[in-house]
Amino acid sequence: MLQDPEIEAVSIVLPDNMHREAVELAVAAKKHILLEKPLAKELEDGKAMYELVKDYDKVFTTGFLLRFDPRFAMIKERLDRGELGDIIHCYVRRNSPIIGPRRYIGASDLSMHVMIHDIDYVNWWMGCQPVKVFARNRSVLLKENGMNDVIYAIVTYENGAIACMEACWTLPENSPTIIDDKVELVATKGVAYVDSCDNGVRFVTGNGVQYPDSRHWYYVNGEVCGDLAEEVMAFVNNVANNTKSVITPKQSYDALRVVDAIERSIREGKEVEL
């Protein structure tokens, strides 16, 4: 497939530990690349991939779909315009039912599969480098699978701002919402909030209460809509117009660096530097 000159672009959705080889092959074949997050499973592979694609003359992007969520983009715009002032601290959470990790057993863990979304957009908002991480975990319901139930991480940035990140994927299977995520960002001139628990629509039936997804991937008239569709269309537009992605290789690598620091902090039981 990579040798076919009519194929200009590839989407890589392989398991995390296979990303490096797939990207290396795609780069050698001079293809535009949409890579599902994370950049890689191991930091060493992520660094090698970053070095490979940082000056790549084709489109390379990583699938952080929250970059295409208008709510998170609005916060970034107001930060860039100075309306909120300088970030003092923020709290973000991303919790979901246990059906998720039961599908992913052995393929990915909580920090890599879930928290990395929040890490990416918080890094993006901060506009500076993360420098220190302290993290704690607990495993109860997923202990026999060798996976974390919950992780809390405190990330300190170069500008002194602090981000507290919470991720849990062991909510009950019958939870009314697929993702319960929240943001509170406190800055010197204002505060920003995001609350995605109810998604703006609710159904009540004999089976209980449901808050279906109306943000990330859903259908309108049979067509996929939401952040995921916007992510794919942004990639297509980059390829068609010969422009760079808003998600840079460095940003993808930095998100992986924070994940690695979270796991190191958990293992060592102390704050670690990046």
Positions of predicted regions on the chain:
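Hydrophobic residues in well-ordered beta-strands that form the structural core
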Residues: 35, 60-62, 91, 194
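Aromatic/hydrophobic pocket-lining residues that form π-stacking "cages" and hydrophobic walls in ligand
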Residues: 22, 49, 75, 261-262
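C-terminal helix-rich "cap/oligomerization" subdomain common to oxidoreductases
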Residues: 9-14, 158, 234-274
